[in-house]
C-alpha cells in the first residue's frame, strides 16, 4: 500500500491529537468548549450577514451610479479635441491638523487639457469614462455639456472630399488588358506591389523600396489604365486624387486636403495614393504677385512634406501621372520622393497590333482581319486612338447591318481617326 500524502497525514495526526485531548477532558471542560465554539459560530454568522448586507448595499450603489452614467451619457455630446495630457504628481506637504485640504490639488494620475467646439479651453483633473492610457493629443472626444467629462472617443474627422477619394469598388482592369507595356508593368510591380506583398525580400537585401512612382508620357498611352490595373492587383486601399481637385479657392484648403488624404491613407494602410494630372499643382516655382499661384505652390510644398517629411510612412505608396514632366518642380522629381520615373512612349508596331487585338477581342471579328497590317497603317497612334479605331470599325459594321467586323471596316476606321487627328478645330465665341 502507498503511504498517504503529507497534508492528509498531518490532518489525521491533528484529529488523533484532538481525540486524545477530548478523552482526557472532564465533562465540564467539554461543555465549556462547546459553548465557546457556539459563540464563535454565532459571531461568524453575524459577520457573514453584515458582509452580505454590505455587498447588497454596494450593488445598489453600483446600480445607482450606472443609472447616473446612463443619464449623463445621453446624446448629444459636445465635441472636443485633446490638446495635452498631463501627469499629476503633487508634492507631499505636511498638513496641519484640521486644515482644509484641496482635493483637486492632491489628485494623482493623468489629467487633460481639452478644447471644445465652442472654442473653450478646459482643464480636466478627472478625465471621465474613458481609459486615460487610450487617449493621445489630437483625439476627437465627446464630452458632457455641463461637466465637460469625457464620455466617449469619436472616430477621426476627415474632409468629406477626402472620404470620397477612396475607391470602394475594385477596378476590373488587368495587366493582360495593357498591350506593349511589359517593361513598364514590371517596373511598376517592383516599385509598388512587391514592397507590399513581399516586404521580407527587401529586408533581406537591406534596401528601402521607392516611396513613389511618376508615370509620364504623351496623352492616351495608358498611364491611368496602368494605375487602375495596379489597384486591382493589390489588396491595398486605393485613394484617387486629381491634381485640379487639390487647387482650392481658400488659402490652406488645398494643403489640408493633401494632409487629410495622407492621414486617411495612414489609418487604412497599406494604401496606394494615385494623383492624376500632378502638373496642376507640381509646376516649377516662380516669383509671382498673384495669391492664387502662391496657394498652388503651398499645396505642392505640403505634398513634398508628406512624401519625405518626418511623418512619412513606408506603407503608403504614391503613383503620380502627368503628360508634362518637363514643367514639374525639381524638388518633386528628386530621389527619395518620386524615386522611379516610368516613361510611356507611343506604342511600337508590335505593341499596336497587340492593343488592337485586346480592344477587339470581345467583338465579332472576321478571321481574315490582319492586325499586323493594321498596325503598320497606324503609325504614331497612341492606345486611346487605337481603341477609337476599333469603335469606329464596329460602328461602320453596324451601319452596314453586318454581323461581323471586316478588315475593310478597320481600314475605314483608321482613315476616320487619322482625319480627326490631323484636322484643326477652331472655336469662336
Curated annotation (Swiss-Prot):
Superkingdom field: Eukaryota
Annotated ATP binding sites: 217-224
Keywords: ATP-binding, Cytoplasm, Nucleotide-binding, Nucleus, Proteasome
Known role: The 26S proteasome is involved in the ATP-dependent degradation of ubiquitinated proteins. The regulatory (or ATPase) complex confers ATP dependency and substrate specificity to the 26S complex.
Example of a GO cellular component annotation carried by this entry: cytoplasm
GO terms assigned for molecular function: ATP binding; ATP hydrolysis activity; proteasome-activating activity
One GO term of the biological process aspect: proteasome-mediated ubiquitin-dependent protein catabolic process
Coiled-coil residue windows: none
Family: Belongs to the AAA ATPase family.
Protein name: 26S proteasome regulatory subunit 6A homolog
Organism (species): Oryza sativa subsp. japonica
Localisation per UniProt entry: Cytoplasm; Nucleus
Residues covered by region (Disordered): 1-21
InterPro entries reported for this sequence: 26S_Proteasome_ATPase, AAA+_ATPase, AAA_lid_3, ATPase_AAA_core, ATPase_AAA_CS, NA-bd_OB-fold, P-loop_NTPase, Prot_ATP_ID_OB_2nd
PROSITE patterns (alphabetical): AAA
